[in-house]
A protein has these predicted regions:
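Hydrophobic/aromatic-rich alpha-helical bundle segments in the mid-to-C-terminal region
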Residues: 93, 112, 130-176
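Hydrophobic/aromatic residues within well-ordered alpha-helical segments
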Residues: 45, 52, 56, 60, ...
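Amphipathic alpha-helical packing segments from all-alpha helical-bundle domains
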Residues: 65, 103-132, 141-145
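Short, Lys/Arg-enriched anionic-surface-contact patches
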Residues: 1-3
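Hydrophobic alpha-helical connector segments
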Residues: 51, 62-88, 143-147
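Helix-turn-helix
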Residues: 6, 10, 14-47, 51
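C-terminal peripheral helix-coil segments that are non-catalytic and often amphipathic
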Residues: 73-84, 120-128, 156-183
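Amphipathic alpha-helical segments used for helix-helix packing
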Residues: 84-106
């Protein structure tokens, strides 16, 4: 089982760096096994990639869904998930922006469904805060779109600019977002 895990970890990192163009020979080399040994664990490169994606989907949505009761916790939770591993950020960018043709539509459908569920959770929190009089009313859809646009922008900035202390940027953006929506 240890070899299987190493194969998956290697494929994860190689997909993040190279996209679908990584080879099983590279995976085998990183793991320290022969290419043929990979087939004892996975039927094909596509099956390996499918399992890698499915595992990351579960980990990502499990981790970020731990803090669903507060907008600020969700904001920092998503950003911190990626801040802890640039490989994860690259993996998700490649998966969402340049999905491999070999990936089944069902996997991308699952990503979109889970993302839509998270969007609804944020929207419900915004509506709840609005009803409590803490934030402006009748702007829940716009605030939700702004919330996720800020997160996606910060994540892209991390890849483009490699800021020295991205956490400071998170704090500045969060504070400005909150100031713009609070009553």
């Amino acid at each position: 089982m240890e070899t299987r895990k190493k194969i998956m970890n290697s494929a994860f990192e190689l997909f993040a760096k190279k996209g679908i163009s990584f080879s099983l020979t590279e995976v085998a080399s990183e793991v320290g096994i022969k290419k043929a040994s990979i087939y004892a664990h996975f039927q094909s490169k596509e099956m390996l990639l499918k399992e890698v994606i499915d595992k990351e989907l579960k980990e990502y949505f499990f981790e970020i869904n731990q803090e669903n009761d507060n907008l600020e916790k969700i904001f920092y939770g998503v950003l911190d998930y990626y801040n802890n591993s640039q490989t994860k950020l690259l993996f998700w960018k490649r998966l969402l922006l340049l999905p491999p043709e070999a990936i089944e539509d069902s996997i991308l459908d699952k990503v979109h469904k889970l993302s839509e569920d998270r969007f609804q959770i944020v929207k419900e929190l915004i509506v709840s805060e609005s009803k409590k009089g803490r934030i402006k009313i009748n702007c829940d859809e716009a605030f939700c779109l702004m919330f996720f646009s800020l997160i996606h922008g910060l994540l892209s900035s991390e890849l483009i600019y490699h800021p020295y202390n991205i956490r400071e940027h998170y704090d500045i953006i969060w504070n400005q977002f909150w100031l713009s929506i609070k009553k």
